[in-house]
Amino acid sequence: IRIAKECVKFNERCFVRLLGDMRSYNYVVDITPDIEGSQYRMRAIDFDQQSYEGRSSFYQPKYFKENNPIIFLGQEHMNVPTMVQYQMEERSLIANRIKASMRRTNNLFKVMVKDQISNPEKVAQLREELSYHHKTDVFDQCDSMGSLVYENLKLVLAKDFKQSTTTFDFPRIE
């Protein structure tokens, strides 16, 4: 169950920062022994698809068939409220990390919003899909991937923002 819990958190980390293509061969599972058994942490090892693609599902590891075994494990052992709880925990951790490094984060976003990370068609597609996913129009003025990442991060980390918490209750991909 711990690995399934970490999968929910990893999916959230990838989606919040728009890190794409996290198939099972693009991340590692870091296992740390502890008093209760082992702690698991999924860590990305391939960053070439950071904020480039236009499809929002590309930024959610749960949609890659290579990840199905671990996704199905989570579906089997966790209910939706538990998954949402883990998503909210991860958002809280991300918010605390950002607060601890606010100046560096601001400097990074100053560069990202000006950089042409992707082409205009993909920016437009992702802008539309994020607006639909989050049920908001905050992305309407975004004209770069950097500004989409910034607004996505701001939105998901906003206190009490819960409408976009996603679950793993999607059709099986064979």
Model-derived regions: residue spans:
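Conserved kinase catalytic-core segment
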Residues: 1-59
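C-terminal catalytic region of ATP-dependent kinase domains
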Residues: 35-174
